[in-house]
Amino acid sequence: MYFLNRTFLKGYYIMKKLNRIKPLSRGHEITWWVCRALLFIWGVWGMLHGYTSEFVQATFAIIFTHLWDMFQLFGGRSFITKVPAYMQTLLNVFICFGCVVGTTLNTRTDFTGIDIPEHIFAGYLACTGAYVLSEIMQGEKQPIKISVQALFSLGFAVSILVGWEYYEFTMDRLYGFTMQHGQAPYSHGLTDTMVDLMLGTGGALAAMFIEAFRRVGIIGGKDRHEKRAAYLAQRAEVKKEKMRLKALEEQSGEIK
């Protein structure tokens, strides 16, 4: 009884330390639950028709659709709690499309072209997420240069794409899957890997330029001119500060 009471109290204190989940807009919430429902139906349908791996895949996919919620609950005071909800929406749509549409076409039809939009969008999504993460980690008081942000986001996206190919290679070797469309003695699997990386990198490059131009106000919606003015004002401040430091260095040199 003492052990149960102690366990209950520990659980209570842990729950009190968890953050509250921020309120969501109705559009995000509906999109998330539609994606989860489709994944659940797809997984159960696959299991009933002999595709047990699809049910396992759907289970893990549904868990990943709750990433934002887990960030909010367990993130404490770290930057991860500041990730915007629309990133989870993009991820959920991608996961749902990749599983329900992509996997179904790959396992039940001879159509193999679904990998092309999947990998392009994966690269775009990874690069866009890297832009958001770089801004959050840097903080509002220390704005990051757009060129540095672009290079970081591209490198981050390519790293994610390479990590996914490691995953595909491992699953094929351990469980006999054909995620890379080839077995060890043949070169077709290597070709598929390289094509996937090139497609994903293409999507990441597109996101790198689009997000950079959007953040400096070259393209965008109604707030484009405001962003452009803020960016130019920031550049002017940086230039002014550099000139001030240069003048101080020259003065100190003359004194010496």
Question: At which residue positions do the language-model features occur?
Answer:
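Bulky hydrophobic segments
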Residues: Y2, T7-P185, M194, T201-K256
